[in-house]
Amino acid sequence: DYVESLRSLQEKYKDRISLKIGLECEYFPDYLHWLKEVIREFKLDYIIFGNHHFHTDEKFPYFGRNTKTVDMLELYEESAIEGMESGLFAYFAHPDLFMRSYPEFDRHCKLISRHICRTAARLNLPLEYNIGYEDYNDAHKITTIPHPDFWKIAAAEGCTAIIGVDAHNNQYLETPFYYD
């Protein structure tokens, strides 16, 4: 069990490191009661906001592959702001995820990025500068996330950032790309 193994490590290394337990979670309004129960049951230290789907993964496609229209961008913005305003999350992971599939950083992207960043700044909610796709971007000679235009807006709006890797597999952390 994930949490149980981390509790064991917390105890084992309590005099050497401070180990926190958290999960990346969606903002799905219909499941908030369940999510709050999970947080209580497992005594999680925090949860991270990952905005991958609009309100549910049962009806809406993944933003990272399917944000190709202004309508999808607007759904991304709406759920991003709702999730941030929920007060549940410690920070917003990869807030520029829509740029994994949106064709170019156009005026629509600028507008929703400004709205997202202003909300994050107002709430004092950090945004994750996710370097987990840097090696992919480099290998394919493209720019997805972290997207420099989004982060210019985040800086201009006075956002706080936290650096993350989004390592779904620990081998991602062992990639020499990130250490050279």
Positions of predicted regions on the chain:
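Active-site groove signature of glycoside hydrolases
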Residues: 87, 91-95, 99
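Charged catalytic cores and adjacent phosphate/nucleic-acid-binding surfaces used
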Residues: 99-100, 104-180
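A metal-dependent hydrolase metal-coordination microenvironment
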Residues: 1-74, 78, 171-174
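Surface-exposed cleft-lining segments at the edges of enzyme active sites
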Residues: 58-71, 97-107, 137
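Hydrophobic faces of well-ordered beta-strands that scaffold small-molecule active sites
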Residues: 19-23, 47-49, 91-93, 127-129, ...
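Hydrophobic, well-ordered secondary-structure segments
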Residues: 73-80, 89, 113
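Low-complexity, flexible helical/coil segments
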Residues: 54-61, 79-87, 126-133, 162-169
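Acidic (Asp/Glu)-rich catalytic clusters
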Residues: 3-16, 36-45, 82-88, 115-124, ...
